[in-house]
């Protein structure tokens, strides 16, 4: 088994090919972590949620962390984003940002999962979705492979096309 630190560029590439992560936020010294779907664009992550604990906590403390990974049988990559929450309010100031977030998210299958599935029994009016951006302030990443995959640089099983990028990334940083 080997593992290697990813460059910022390679870490951002992992984000560009990933849509599910775990968002961590803190309020009153208490951490909270939840799954979120996101879309990466221009050094930011875009997502949405219905009103609730996650939004309340990020409003109180906009410093957040997102962990995202890609795991396969013989190789993996994981990144951690340190960033700042910014709510994209339904105002003229954020109109284009909200449209961008919506367009980026719609490109992903099941993009509304996690953020849009909260139930609100007895609500007279359905909750309004809250779009937000996480501006990336710092990112770290690591990748690795089994000893067999690291030794010969090949996979023992075929790699589906949608996962080819991860194998190429690993081969580019594989030790000699």
Which role does the model predict for each range below?
Residues 49-52, 61-69, 108-120:
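Short acidic (Asp/Glu) patches
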């Amino acid at each position: 088994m080997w593992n290697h630190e990813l460059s910022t560029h390679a870490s951002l590439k992992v984000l560009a090919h990933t849509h599910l992560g775990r968002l961590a936020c803190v309020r009153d010294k208490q951490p909270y972590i939840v799954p979120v779907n996101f879309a990466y664009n221009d050094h930011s992550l875009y997502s949405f949620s219905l009103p609730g604990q996650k939004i309340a906590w990020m409003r109180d403390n906009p410093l957040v962390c997102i962990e995202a990974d890609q795991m396969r049988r013989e190789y993996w990559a994981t990144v951690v984003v340190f960033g700042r929450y910014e709510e994209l309010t339904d105002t003229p100031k954020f109109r284009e940002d909200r449209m961008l977030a919506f367009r980026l998210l719609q490109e992903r299958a099941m993009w509304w999962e996690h953020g849009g599935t909260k139930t609100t029994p007895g609500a007279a009016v359905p909750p309004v979705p809250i779009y937000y951006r996480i501006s990336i302030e710092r990112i770290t990443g690591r990748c690795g492979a089994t000893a067999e995959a690291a030794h010969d640089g090949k996979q023992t099983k075929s790699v589906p096309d949608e996962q080819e990028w991860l194998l190429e990334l690993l081969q580019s940083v594989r030790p000699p």
